[in-house]
Amino acid sequence: MVTESQVVVPQNWEGSVPEYIAYQTFIQLGREPGKDFTYQSPLMGGRMEKGGFVLDFLFDNPPDLAVNVQGVYYHYEFGVEAKARDVMARASLAGQNITLIFIDDDDLMKDPRFYCREALNYKDHSRLGGG
């Protein structure tokens, strides 16, 4: 298992350590940023608009796939409002034929290749996905 303190993240990285691990793992799995996926993709106005949100990863390869890294504390222990936002984001994307897969940060720290590969195969092992 990797701990956040063991990961060297570039100073200009704007996301979380688990998001960086996922980013690097998707690259190791043969996906190219800017071509196969976009990192931090705002939809429906992003966080600045009511009902908008930001996807951690929006993929073109494979098509119609989005992946969000879920911080266990914020997304599960912070209350029902955070969970409701995640469920609404998933439903909104489903209406656009995009599958939103969640990867829990604690799972990502244990085995990034497994969980990222599973996400690329549209398999959700997160607490929200029933995993």
PLM-predicted stretches and their roles:
Residues M1-G131:
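Nucleic-acid endo/exonuclease domains
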